[in-house]
């Protein structure tokens, strides 16, 4: 395959780049990407799965458009963002990148649904019939996933598993929304294996409702997620480093 030409992006000020610890000196983005892909490959082999069936979603929240452009030049095409207004500021610089797709993976308030539908190709965090109807009203074809809350943490968003039949029915009544699967965010733990029961439960819920897409797993626990059936892993820190001031 011929090399991908570098993305053409507006200049970014030195102060903007210096503010974020974008690419720690220990490794380049290319090296980090190779390491993440190797982890995905190894986990898929252990699970006797085809790694081509696993999407690497590069989570670029809080990083400038310049970073998206560099990741794109290295072959990444799927990007995740958590904040509508933040991505609205970056979108003019990146929405014209051929083949790039942008996923919303944060909590989406219904009053921002119209703007989110305009900016993103996939909304992974639909958690209520009301939000589904707001996205439908935007009149744009969208891929959607349903966020499921599988823990008792009050800070976590998502639909209760018992509410899934009603939510699935509501989404399927929306002609502009294409339902592709389920998404979850387990409670944080230093032990990657602590997330496995949550991943397994999401897979079982997807199977019960005839859905194939599973967005689960992040930088520290992607192996467990893949072994439990993830079709999309959301990776930020392992690619771009910690999101912190320099």
Q: What are these model-predicted stretches?
A:
Residues 2, 9-220, 226-228, 240-242:
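Conserved alpha/beta-domain cores
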